[in-house]
A protein has these predicted regions:
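Conserved Rossmann-like nucleotide-cofactor binding loop
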Residues: 12, 35, 282
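Glycine-rich FAD pyrophosphate-binding loop
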Residues: 21-45
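Mid-domain catalytic core of redox enzymes
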Residues: 23, 237-359, 366-373, 377, ...
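Hydrophobic anchor at the start of a short beta-strand
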Residues: 25-27, 275, 397-400
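Conserved flavin/dinucleotide-binding core of flavoenzymes
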Residues: 98-100, 322-325, 339-480
Length: 480
C-alpha cells in the first residue's frame, strides 16, 4: 500500500510528489492525460521553441526558481532579453508601460506624467491617490473597484483590466484584489496611499537577470526534470481517478488498513493512508461528492475560464514593428478580440531561427468566453487580424499553432478567501485528505510549487504523527 496517492500531474501535483519523495514518503501519482505538466507545455517545432502555456518564472516569487536549482537546472536559467519593456494598446497604438511601477501601479509619478497612455485628467486623478483615505471596510473588493477607488476609472481601464486581471484571464470587476494582490490591500491598510508607500521604499536595483527567468527549451524542461527526479513506477499516466472512498477514520490502525481508496475509470481500487487532490476544483468536487456534499459544493463554486494560445512565426522582414520588448496587453475597451500578445523571439534568446520571429496571441478568458467555441482556424484568423495592423505584418505566417486550455484558469473572484476558509474547515472533517493547486491557494507556477511542497510537508507530518509505516525517513521499494 502506498502511503499517499496524489491525483493530478500538473505543476502542483508534481511539486507535491517531488517533496514527498524528498522526505522519503511513498506515493503514487495518477494523471489522466498522456503526459504530466498540465498547462506547462513546450514544443520544439522546426527550430522554434514554443511555450503553449506559461513561459516565465517570476524572480520576486523564487519558489519556482529554487525548484529548478534543486533539479540541476540552475545554470540553465536565462533572463529576458533587453529592452525589458511591455506595451499597452490604446487607440490602436502601442504605448510603453511607464517605468517605475509595480504591476502598473506607479512608484514614481514622473514616468507617468510623460506617457501618452493616459489623458491629463487621468494622470491628475492618479496623482490624487495620495489623498484618498484608506477603506475602513475590511470586506473583500474587486480589483476594478479597488483601482477605481484609489486611482480612478482610467487607471482601472488601461492598467488594472489588461494587466492585473488580464494575467489571470479574468474579469476585473469580479476578481478579488485580496486573494490575488494582498500586498496592495495590506499597503493601503498600513500606509493609506499606495503611491506614498511605494515612493518611500528604497529604490530597488533591477537584477541583471531582470524580473523573469525561463529555460532554453521552455518551461517544459522543468516538467521533464521533475518527472525524471521521481521513481518511474510512481507516476501513472492515462489513469483517471473516478471516485474517492473513505474506508475508515484516519486514526492509527494496528492492522495497517487503508484510510482511503481511490477508484479509477479502469476498474482499479487503490488503497492509501492519505490522498492529495491536485486537480481543478471542479474535478475535486466530483471526487469528494460521495463523502462530503458540502465540500463538493464549495469546490464546485470556484469558477474557471477557458483560453487559447495562438503561436505564429514570420520572417523578420515581414514584420515592420521593431518588436523592441516582450509584448503587449489589450484593454477590454479596445475590442480587438485578443487579450495580449507575447513576442517570444524578442523576449527570450534562441527561440526562433535567424531572421525569423515567433510570437503568441492569447484569446478568450472571462472577458470573451464564447471565443473558445471558435474553430482553430477562426482563432488563428482572429488573432492575426488583431496583430497585423498593430505590428505591420505582411503575408502569411510561416507557422501557426493553436493550443486550447479548457477550464484551465481558476478565477479567484470576490469571496474566494471566505470560500477557501470554508473548504479548509470541511477538509478538517477528513484527516488525511488534502487539496492543492490553482483553484485553491495561488494561481501561478511559483504559488503552485510553494503550495504543493507545503502540502507535502503537512502530509509527511500528519503521517508521522499517525505513525504510518514508511511515512518518513523510510522509502518504499519503488523509492529505493
Amino acid at each position: 500500500m502506498n502511503n499517499v496517492i496524489v491525483v493530478g500531474g500538473g505543476i502542483a501535483g508534481l511539486s507535491t510528489a517531488y517533496e514527498l519523495h524528498r522526505r522519503g514518503v511513498s506515493f503514487v501519482l495518477l494523471e489522466r492525460g498522456a503526459r504530466a505538466g498540465g498547462v506547462v507545455l513546450s514544443e520544439q517545432i522546426d527550430g522554434y521553441t514554443v511555450d503553449a502555456g506559461p513561459d516565465a518564472l517570476l524572480v520576486q516569487k523564487p519558489e519556482g526558481i529554487r525548484l529548478c536549482e534543486e533539479l540541476g537546472l540552475g545554470d540553465r536559467l536565462v533572463p529576458t532579453k533587453p529592452p525589458r519593456v511591455a506595451f499597452i494598446q490604446r487607440g490602436g497604438r502601442l504605448h510603453p508601460l511607464p517605468a517605475a511601477s509595480v504591476l502598473g501601479i506607479p512608484t514614481r509619478l514622473g514616468p507617468f506624467i510623460g506617457t501618452r497612455l493616459f489623458s491629463w485628467r487621468g494622470k491628475l486623478r492618479m496623482g490624487a491617490e495620495l489623498f484618498v483615505p484608506a477603506r475602513r471596510d475590511r470586506g473583500d473588493e474587486s480589483i476594478g473597484a479597488f483601482m477605481t477607488r484609489r486611482f480612478g476609472a482610467e487607471a482601472a481601464t488601461y492598467l488594472a483590466e489588461p494587466l492585473l486581471a488580464g494575467i489571470h484571464a479574468g474579469d476585473v470587476d469580479r476578481l478579488s484584489v485580496g486573494a490575488l494582490f494582498p500586498r496592495f490591500t495590506d499597503v493601503e491598510r498600513r500606509h493609506g496611499s499606495l503611491l506614498r508607500a511605494f515612493r518611500r521604499q528604497p529604490k530597488a536595483q533591477e537584477s541583471a537577470r531582470g524580473a523573469f527567468l525561463s529555460l532554453p527549451g521552455g518551461l517544459g524542461e522543468m516538467i521533464r526534470a521533475l518527472v525524471a527526479a521521481l521513481p518511474p513506477a510512481s507516476i501513472r499516466l492515462a489513469t483517471t481517478a473516478s471516485r474517492l472512498v473513505v474506508e475508515r477514520d484516519a486514526r492509527p490502525d494496528p492492522l495497517d488498513r487503508p484510510a482511503f481508496r481511490v477508484e479509477t475509470s479502469g476498474g482499479e481500487s487503490l488503497p492509501a493512508s492519505a490522498v492529495v487532490l491536485a486537480t481543478p476544483a471542479f474535478v475535486t468536487a466530483r471526487l469528494v461528492r460521495g463523502i462530503d456534499a458540502e465540500l463538493a459544493d464549495l469546490c464546485d463554486e470556484v469558477p474557471y475560464a477557458s483560453t487559447a494560445t495562438v503561436a505564429f512565426a514570420f520572417s523578420r522582414a515581414a514584420v515592420a514593428h521593431p518588436l523592441n520588448g516582450s509584448g503587449f496587453v489589450v484593454p477590454r475597451v479596445e475590442g480587438t478580440g485578443i487579450l495580449a500578445a507575447s513576442w517570444l523571439s524578442s523576449k527570450w534568446p534562441n527561440r526562433a531561427p535567424q531572421d525569423r520571429v515567433l510570437m503568441r496571441a492569447f484569446v478568450g478568458g472571462a472577458r470573451d468566453p464564447r471565443a473558445f467555441e471558435d474553430s482553430d482556424e477562426e482563432l488563428a484568423a482572429r488573432s492575426l487580424n488583431a496583430l497585423r495592423p498593430l505590428l505591420g505584418i505582411a503575408g502569411a505566417p510561416l507557422l501557426t499553432r493553436v493550443y486550447r486550455w479548457e477550464r484551465a484558469s481558476a478565477q479567484h473572484e470576490v469571496g474566494h478567501l471566505a470560500r477557501l476558509s470554508a473548504i479548509e474547515r470541511a477538509l478538517a472533517r477528513h484527516p488525511g485528505l488534502f487539496v492543492t493547486g490553482s483553484g485553491f491557494r495561488g494561481v501561478g507556477i511559483p504559488d503552485c510549487v510553494a503550495d504543493g511542497r507545503a502540502t507535502a510537508g503537512q502530509i509527511a507530518g500528519w503521517l508521522a504523527e499517525a505513525r504510518v509505516p514508511n511515512a518518513a525517513g523510510q522509502r518504499s521499494g519503488d523509492d529505493r
